[in-house]
Amino acid sequence: MNFEHTSVLLKECIEALDIKENGIYVDGTLGGAGHSQEILKVLGKEGLLIGIDQDENALSAAGERLEEHGTKVKLVHDNFHNLDKILENLEITTIDGVLLDLGVSSHQLDERERGFSYMQDAPLDMRMDRRSGFSARDIVNDYSEKELERIIKEYGEDRWARRIAQFIVQERELAPIETTHQMVEVIKKAVPKGARKDGPHPAKRTFQAIRIEVNQELEIIEATIEAAAKHMKPGGRIAIISFHSLEDRIVKNVFRRLQNPCVCPPQFPVCKCEKEQMVKIVTRKPILPSEAELEVNPRSRSAKLRVAERV
């Protein structure tokens, strides 16, 4: 199976994880296994990589690529949100590092029938995990106008959210919206012509919003970081690559909260809440792709890497 994906910030991620030879590492977004392959190069015979992906195509292709590493690899078909359960099933209590790449893989974008891309016509789907029964089609055809406006505004940060929601509802009253091409045409009608001259494709933000809603992407980030920190050995690291401001803001804020969890009023001279620091932030500012990487992989342009270390 051909599952091509160019790993973003590859060298930077491996350095950030500060890999211990016999450590246990979790790649929560296995994808094309590019990051995992580099982690395995550093791991010794006693080391272990746990690769998690909810996309069965990615998992199958990664299994073939990583087959030579034998028992050093355990692959799990699941969502990284279930990290607690996954580690429990593997009878693992502590780990040395976690890597999350929150972007949609190049393969998923390019695989027309998955319905992630506004550049190719396909059924409205956008499910990362195709075992799920809930797809983009359900959102577009079943959500109320107010619900559509909310997700397009919050998750897509689109100034035309209200108009787009109105036009979606008007269009689906005539006939269900079934394909990405239909969806793009509705958005083009909704966004004024003058606003379409500059900036990204008019459908980019709405497609992002719907994808986030289908896969509940933002809700699971915070819980996963907390679970990773709970299982992390002191000195272990959490490295997270985000691709838009909503994700990056969540990662930054959760890291800050875990670094300074005290909820006591500022006038208290001594902490009384007894909430203990779990991590220290390694990256004061996010690590960005180099110019060299941008030339090779333009899709990496919006990537940001943040790292925290367990204390």
Curated annotation (Swiss-Prot):
Reactions catalysed, as given in the entry: cytidine(1402) in 16S rRNA + S-adenosyl-L-methionine = N(4)-methylcytidine(1402) in 16S rRNA + S-adenosyl-L-homocysteine + H(+)
Single GO term (MF): rRNA (cytosine-N4-)-methyltransferase activity
One term under GO cellular component: cytoplasm
Record-listed E.C. numbers: 2.1.1.199
Subcellular localization(s) per the UniProt record: Cytoplasm
Keywords per UniProt: Cytoplasm, Methyltransferase, rRNA processing, S-adenosyl-L-methionine, Transferase
Broad class of the protein's primary localization: cytoplasm
Primary enzyme class: transferase
Binding site for S-adenosyl-L-methionine: A33, G34, H35, D53, F80, D101, Q108
GO biological process: rRNA base methylation
Keyword NADP: no
Record flagged with keyword S-adenosyl-L-methionine: yes
Role description: Specifically methylates the N4 position of cytidine in position 1402 (C1402) of 16S rRNA.
Entry similarity comment: Belongs to the methyltransferase superfamily. RsmH family.
Name of the protein this chain belongs to: Ribosomal RNA small subunit methyltransferase H 1
Organism: Alkaliphilus metalliredigens (strain QYMF)
